[in-house]
């Protein structure tokens, strides 16, 4: 299924959870923190400004992004995969290689 979020919303696939610490300790699923990184899989058309103009989003499909621990509280299931839906303003940064 193909998604097209509305306005300034972004759909993100969360990165895989870290199940091992830097010291090599394996964490059980309940102790592992949900990652706050992901890949943008769909973007809306942009934010509608007060004057009616549409400001395009600064992120694009394929961008690796960092977001807050409480961002993306809206999850949807698409083709068996959990995806996050959040506003562009909930994204802190784009990870550049």
UniProtKB/Swiss-Prot annotation:
Gene3D superfamilies in the record: GroES chaperonin
SUPFAM superfamilies reported for this sequence: GroES-like
Gene Ontology BP term (one): chaperone cofactor-dependent protein refolding
Main localization of the protein described in the UniProt heading: cytoplasm
Family listed: Belongs to the GroES chaperonin family.
HAMAP family: CH10 (MF_00580)
Name under which the protein is recorded: Co-chaperonin GroES
Organism: Azotobacter vinelandii (strain DJ / ATCC BAA-1303)
């Amino acid at each position: 299924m193909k998604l097209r979020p509305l306005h300034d919303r972004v759909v993100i696939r969360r990165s895989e959870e870290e199940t091992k610490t830097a010291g090599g300790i394996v964490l059980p699923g309940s102790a592992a923190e949900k990652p706050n990184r992901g890949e943008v899989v769909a973007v809306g058309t942009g934010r509608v400004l007060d004057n009616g103009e549409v400001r395009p989003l600064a992120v694009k499909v394929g961008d690796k992004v960092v977001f807050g621990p409480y961002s993306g509280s809206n999850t949807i299931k698409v083709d068996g995969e959990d995806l996050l839906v959040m506003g562009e303003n909930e994204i802190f940064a784009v990870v550049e290689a």
